[in-house]
Amino acid sequence: MKKYSIAAIAAVVGVLTFGPPVEAAEKFQKLSGSQIRARLAGMEITDEAHWADVFAANGTLTSYSMGRKNSGKWHVQNDELCIDRGNDDGGCYQVWLSGKKIELRRAGSSLPLEGVLQKQSVRR
């Protein structure tokens, strides 16, 4: 009878139980100013449930959150997306993209705003 090491048995049991190892985190790429303009104009960023920010090509920002609609402005400055909602909820962000997934990262914050970049949805 062959002897198997405990580590080898544990590895096989782990793969059978949990599946193969997952690849490293998705590869996000930082967008330049021109890429931000090209990707966001006419599109929306949303969590697909509670909120959406619609980026019009003319720099108008329309936000929908929990049934409420608000307006603001957006522009690109120094390779960052800058949002002005008329309150303290604005600022400038680095934009990182991986497929349809998007992250807005603010300097000094470790928590990005995460969402999905998609064509504008029809809202009533």
Please name every model-derived segment:
Residues 2-9, 18-124:
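Lipid interaction determinants
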Residues 13:
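Structured alpha-helical
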